[in-house]
Amino acid sequence: MRPVSGDPPTDPSSERPLRAGDWVEVRSLAEIRATLDGEGRRNGFLFMPEMVPFCGRRFQVSKRAEKTCYGSRFLRVGGAVHLAGARCNGSAHDGCELQCLTFWREEWLRRVDGPQEVGNRPAAAPVGRSAGGGSAVATGRPAALPTRVDSPGDGTVFICQATALRDVTREPVGAWNPRPYFHEIHVGNAGWAEAKQLIRWSLAWGRLRVFKAFSRQQSTPKAPRERIDVGDWVEVRSAPEILATLTKFGKNRGLRLSEDMLTFCGERFRVERSVTRFIDETTGRMKVMQSPCLVLESATCRGFNILCPRAQFHFWRPEWLRRLDGSSGAPPPDSPAGKPPPRT
C-alpha cells in the first residue's frame, strides 16, 4: 500500500480544507502532471484521462472524500474532494458505464470566488494509445495516465480511480462506530437532517435482513416485467413488490438489491440510460451483463449507513419499477421537473 499523507489543506492560498459548497477551478494539466508520480498518481489517487477535459473548469465541491465504499467494505480516505457533476465517462476504459464520481486531490484544485470562468479555458490534451496498450494523454510523457495492464495469459486488467482505491485507503470504517458520523458533520459533508436518515436506512436494512433470513427462494422468481425505455418516467415499486422478485440472497438474476435502494420506494424518476458493461473495482475486469439494467436520473446511493459521499448510480431491474402512463416526454404533473415527490 502506498503511503498516504495527512489531510490537507494543500492549496497554500487556502486557510482551511475545502468543504461542501466551496467553488474551485481545476488546475491546468501541466500543473496537475507536476504533482504525479511515474504511475500517474498522487498519494495513491490516480489521475485519469477522463479527467483531462475538466482542467480549467470551475465546479462546486459536493462533498469531502473522507470515506468511501470499496467492494463490500467501507474505508477511510482523506485529502480529496468530490466535485458536483464531475463524473468519469469511461471513454478511456473501453466504455465502462458506471459513471463514477471522480476523486480530486486538493493539490489539483484552486479555490475561486464563484462559478464564473474568466478568460479562455485551457484546451484539453487529446487522449491517445500508449505503447504499452493503455491510454495516455499525449503530452510527451508516455503512459503517464495508464488505464490498463494487458497480459497475454491473463487478459486485460483495467486501472482507474475505483480499482486504485485500495492504494489510498487507510483503515476500515465500522458501520456502527459513531465517530465517523460526527466527523462528517464536522467537515460539512452532512447535517443533522442527513444523520436522521440513518433511521430510514436502518429500517430498510432490517427489512431486507429479515427477508433473507426467512426466504427459501433459490432462483429468481418470475415476476411481471414492463417494457421500460430510456426517457420513460417510472415509479420505484413498493418494498413488498420488490422483495417478491428476489432470491433468498437478495438478488434478481444476479443483481443484488441494496438496503439503500429500498429507501427509494414510491419515488419517481426518469430513466437516464441502460447499462450493459462496467469494470469490477475489486478485480479490474470488465463485466458484461446478459440482462441490461436501468439507471435513473439522480438516483444515486445516498450512503445513509456511513454517510458515504461517493454517490454511485444504482442499477435497477425493470421488475422493480412501474412505468407511469403517458410517461414519455414531459414529467408527470405530480413530479415537477422530474424530481421525486416530497418525502413524508
Language model segments and positions:
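Basic/aromatic-rich interaction segments and small domains that mediate binding to polyanionic partners
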Residues: 2-20, 29-127, 140-204, 208-230, ...
